[in-house]
């Protein structure tokens, strides 16, 4: 349109103060463009007569008139300072780069569009041809005619924008990003796409949506490692793994069940464990061997057994069944010489010992007598527990070696080894006729019971406990203690739920038979260390 004006006059007056120009003082590049791009010469000027900024001072007529043609102004735009690197010269590298980028964008856009041909006779075709001719005539000589020119205002704004942005915000936007941001009508919209940077340099990531069909990776757990060896060494009674030297874990030679020496009933002796060829069977294995009936009826010749196999079989049988086999063989073959020449003498000695033992059982015994008798009876019971088929009137010889290994301590030895703090304090206070200080009590206990290693704090708690029970008297200052010799054994306790019968003889308290063999009439309740214990009297 050669006759169209560059600015259409709207007929109104122009006011510089109220002009809504977007590049005002808040623009980020105040050094390249003047804050006020347009200013009116007089109050009666309209928008068709304006002054251009310093970048466009090369135009001959600074006032763009509506009657002037646009191409005449562009012809003289680049003439002054043609060879210099001024802002208005096309020799400037930034301007050349901007024109080259616009050319590439125009070429890519044309290649993506479908081919379109217009009829030469149509009016639209003629109109576009005239507009293109005017645009080509307005291009500078060093710009190709095939390129699509940009208006001078757009070129200036793009150059100023790129120069004014800081280096941290000047993010290179490639063709892909421009294609994502641009729209068909030329406007730029900002989308929150994954992996796309905004103009300020911030990365925008799209939130991940929950998909119930997607299986999340799970951590695979390996096979559990259990200490099989350690569990196999656990005592079957107390369920502990510790095996101290004085209470070792022993495995049964029959069922391979582990037991502590003190946990198994009866106690497992150290001599049996120290012997290289010793075998030990638990009580369950011995009971099963007892209950198994003895089956006979076949000879070793028929089974073709060797001497070692015969010995192994006979050792597996309990003693009672072996005695029965010997008696049965004697009945079949009385001429077998398996008796000792001193058999009658041995039997008489055993009978005399047994009669003496049964005579003393009906007499009242003291602590020492009970110890000696208990030593003999326990040894006899251990050596004859499997000989149930023997006559009851024939005593069995006592194993002297077993008696020495199972020696029962005396009362003093027992107090030093197994008594608690309350018993020790009572014994010490009983040895003093008058009240003594706390230091005297502790020194006496440390000297007499040095192997126990009793702490002073335990002695203090024991004294306080005995004072509450009225067994020990303490003075008003709390510095001396004395045994309460007037303690009434028949007086009931202060606590209504427990009755105290007082101290009982030490022989009865330490060495008593099993309570399940006695009735309730022969038992008495004794509170020791604030715990009721049922003790039986003889």
From Swiss-Prot:
GO cellular component, one term: pericentric heterochromatin
Gene3D superfamilies cross-referenced by the UniProt entry: Zinc/RING finger domain, C3HC4 (zinc finger)
Record text on subunit structure and interactions: Component of the SWM histone demethylase complex composed of at least lsd1, lsd2, phf1 and phf2.
GO terms for biological process, alphabetical: chromatin remodeling; heterochromatin boundary formation; negative regulation of gene expression, epigenetic; positive regulation of DNA-templated transcription
Compartments reported by the entry: Nucleus
Lineage top rank: taxon: Eukaryota
Cross-referenced Pfam families: PHD
Protein name per the record: SWM histone demethylase complex subunit phf2
Ranges of biased composition (kind: Basic and acidic residues): 98-111
Zinc finger (PHD-type): 232-288
């Amino acid at each position: 349109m050669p006759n169209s004006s560059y600015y259409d006059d709207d007929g109104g007056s122009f006011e510089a103060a109220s002009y809504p120009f977007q590049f005002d003082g808040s623009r980020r590049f105040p050094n390249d463009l003047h804050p006020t791009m347009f200013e009116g010469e007089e109050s009666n000027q309209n928008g068709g007569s304006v002054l251009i900024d310093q970048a466009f001072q090369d135009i001959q007529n600074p006032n763009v008139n509506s009657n002037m043609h646009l191409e005449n102004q562009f012809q003289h735009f680049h003439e002054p300072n043609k060879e210099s690197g001024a802002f208005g010269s096309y020799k400037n590298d930034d301007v050349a780069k901007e024109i080259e980028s616009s050319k590439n964008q125009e070429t890519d856009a044309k290649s993506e569009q479908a081919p379109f041909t217009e009829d030469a006779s149509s009016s639209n075709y003629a109109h576009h041809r005239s507009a293109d001719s005017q645009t080509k005539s307005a291009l500078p000589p060093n710009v190709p005619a095939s390129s699509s020119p940009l208006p001078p205002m757009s070129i200036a704004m793009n150059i100023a924008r790129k120069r004014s942005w800081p280096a941290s915000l000047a993010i290179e936007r490639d063709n892909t990003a421009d294609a994502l941001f641009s729209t068909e009508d030329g406007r730029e919209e900002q989308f929150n796409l994954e992996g796309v940077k905004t103009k300020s340099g911030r990365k925008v990531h799209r939130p991940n949506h929950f998909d119930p069909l997607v299986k999340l990776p799970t951590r695979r757990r390996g096979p559990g490692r259990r200490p099989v060896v350690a569990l196999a060494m656990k005592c079957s009674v107390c369920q502990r793994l510790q095996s101290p030297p004085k209470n070792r874990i022993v495995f049964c030679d029959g069922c391979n069940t582990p037991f502590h020496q003190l946990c198994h009933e009866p106690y497992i002796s150290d001599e049996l464990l120290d012997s290289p060829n010793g075998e030990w069977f638990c009580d369950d294995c011995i009971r099963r061997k007892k209950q198994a009936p003895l089956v006979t009826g076949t000879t070793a010749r028929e089974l073709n057994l060797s001497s070692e196999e015969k010995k192994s079989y006979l050792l597996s049988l309990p003693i009672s069944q072996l005695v029965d086999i010997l008696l049965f063989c004697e009945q079949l073959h009385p001429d077998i010489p398996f008796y000792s020449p001193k058999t009658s003498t041995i039997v008489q000695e055993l009978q005399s010992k047994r009669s003496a033992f049964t005579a003393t059982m009906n007499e009242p015994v003291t602590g020492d007598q009970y110890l000696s008798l208990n030593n003999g009876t326990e040894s006899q019971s251990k050596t004859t527990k499997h000989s149930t088929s023997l006559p009851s009137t024939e005593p069995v010889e006592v194993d002297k070696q077993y008696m020495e290994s199972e020696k029962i301590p005396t009362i003093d030895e027992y107090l030093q080894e197994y008594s608690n703090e309350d018993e020790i304090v009572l014994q010490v206070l009983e040895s003093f006729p008058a009240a003594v200080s706390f230091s005297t009590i502790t020194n006496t206990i440390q000297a007499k019971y040095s192997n126990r290693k009793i702490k002073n704090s335990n002695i203090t708690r024991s004294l306080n406990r005995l004072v509450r029970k009225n067994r020990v008297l303490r003075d008003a200052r709390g510095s001396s203690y004395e045994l309460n010799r007037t303690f009434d054994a028949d007086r009931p306790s202060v606590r209504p739920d427990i009755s105290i019968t007082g101290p009982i003889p030490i022989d009865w308290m330490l060495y008593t038979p099993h309570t399940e063999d006695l009735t309730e009439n022969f038992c008495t309740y004794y509170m020791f260390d604030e715990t009721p214990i049922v003790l039986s009297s003889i």
